[in-house]
Regions:
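Catalytic-site signature of metal-activated, phosphate-bearing donor transferases
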Residues: 1-52
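Short coil turns that delineate tetratricopeptide repeat
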Residues: 27-28, 62, 66, 100, ...
């Protein structure tokens, strides 16, 4: 048996350098180039430059709607990384300009409110995510867990923090139906067992 393996890891900066070289040469960026350059900047935590590039992409009238929606998410990551929480929230909401809400965006909005102790608002967004179906034919980057496990486990956590364990526990069970081996689900399962013990 012959195996072909790479001797070393790939160059994670390769694509970023390509776009940076294009910029140095003053080459014209097509909307698609701006989008992918922005994603590369975000993945390398270059948030200020990423914010600028993604905003330029979102201002451009051209560009595929799925890329616009994801660019709004990536812009939010930049804003969070720069400590601009309100701008991050606005970036997520901007995605609604392009199409119906996606599970990924709803989960991001849920997380925004969860992290700030605003559990009722978080519940709203996680419930929206749980009620959506992924647009598999769209060609978009889909995070399957944003349509089942993530909103379910998060709803369990939100309701627990609200003191509504009668709602929290069923959502944890639902999360377990999606990922029965999840350490988070299993830990919560033990927590609820202890809670309900007489």
């Amino acid at each position: 048996v012959i195996e072909h393996r790479k001797e070393r890891k790939g160059d994670s900066f390769r694509n970023l350098r390509i776009y940076q070289d294009m910029e140095k040469r003053n080459e014209e960026f097509l909307p698609r180039d701006l989008y992918y350059y922005g994603r590369e900047l975000v993945s390398h935590r270059l948030y200020e430059k990423g914010r600028q590039v993604l905003q330029a992409f979102l201002r451009d009238r051209e560009g595929w709607k799925e890329n616009k929606i994801d660019a709004a998410r990536q812009l939010a990551v930049c804003c969070y990384g720069l400590g601009q929480e309100e701008e991050a929230l606005l970036a997520l909401l901007q995605s609604f300009v392009y199409d119906m809400p996606r599970g990924e965006i709803c989960c991001d909005l849920g997380r925004h409110f969860l992290d700030r102790g605003r559990y009722r608002e978080a519940v709203f967004w996680y419930e929206q995510a749980l009620g959506l179906k992924p647009e598999r034919d769209s060609g978009a980057f889909i995070q399957e867990e944003c349509y089942d496990f993530l909103p379910a486990i998060s709803l369990g956590g939100c309701y627990d923090r609200l003191g509504e364990c009668d709602k929290a526990e069923p959502y944890n069970r639902l999360a377990g139906s999606f990922r029965p081996d999840s350490p988070c689900y299993l830990q919560n399962l033990e927590y609820f067992k202890k809670l309900w013990r007489p």
